[in-house]
Design a protein with these regions (language model features):
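Sec-dependent N-terminal signal peptides
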Residues: 4-13
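Short, surface-exposed coil-to-beta transition loops
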Residues: 101-104, 132-138
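Short, low-complexity N-terminal intrinsically disordered segments enriched in polar/charged residues
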Residues: 19-67, 170-180
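Hydrophobic pocket/interface hotspot
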Residues: 48, 64-65, 72-73, 87, ...
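A solvent-exposed, acidic/Ser-Thr-rich amphipathic alpha-helical stretch
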Residues: 61-111
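C-terminal segment of classical bacterial N-terminal signal peptides
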Residues: 14-18
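Short beta-strand edge/turn micro-motifs at domain boundaries
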Residues: 136-167
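A short hydrophobic beta-strand element
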Residues: 112-123
Length: 180
């Protein structure tokens, strides 16, 4: 139990320290936490929060590779490469084109080893908070032995540009893991 609490606090501290002095969006796990979560579910939510904060908002890819690359991460989004290295490679190129890309988490749900984020992703700072722009995303991660091992998502493009982007980028199959 002490290990879970200590790990959770360290993850939250590392996430906050990196994003504190920037204009990056910060995921506030405390405000999104549900009262019925067990200590293990809170630890799972903190793990995914740290992962998403550093990957999608801080774009701290070196941190992601150092902290999460040892897991056997299976990507079920067929448009993304498999494994953490594939995901980091894709996103590092993506944020070169869209450096203000952010992931505003609206809800977090946890059921045992499954963590679900409902989020609003945008490409531009000016679009943050505008539910007519960007993408409505529901992500599900599976945790096993304190590691993120699987990811599924469902993405709804909210504006014409994102619908066009989804159309032109949606045809490339980057892994053979299946969507379920």
């Amino acid at each position: 139990m002490l290990k879970i609490i200590t790990s959770t606090l360290l993850i939250l501290a590392s996430t906050s320290a990196f994003a504190q002095n920037s204009d990056k969006l910060v995921i506030n796990l405390e405000s999104l936490q549900k009262p019925g979560w067990t200590q293990q579910e809170l630890a799972n939510a903190a793990l995914v929060t740290d992962f998403v904060q550093n990957l999608m908002n801080n774009h701290n890819f070196d941190y992601i590779l150092a902290q999460y690359n040892d897991s056997s991460y299976v990507q079920h989004n067929r448009n993304l490469p498999d494994k953490i290295t594939g995901l980091v490679s894709f996103l590092s190129e993506f944020v070169e084109d869209y450096p203000d890309y952010t992931y505003d988490v609206k809800h977090i749900y946890v059921d045992g080893d499954y963590v679900i984020f409902h989020s609003h992703a945008t490409l531009k700072k000016d679009d943050r908070g505008n539910d007519q722009k960007g993408m409505n995303i529901i992500d599900t991660w599976r945790i096993e032995n304190g590691k993120i091992v699987e990811h599924w998502d469902s993405i709804q493009a909210l504006d014409t540009f994102m619908r066009f982007y989804s159309l032109v980028s949606g045809g490339n199959i980057e892994n053979s893991n299946g969507v379920f």
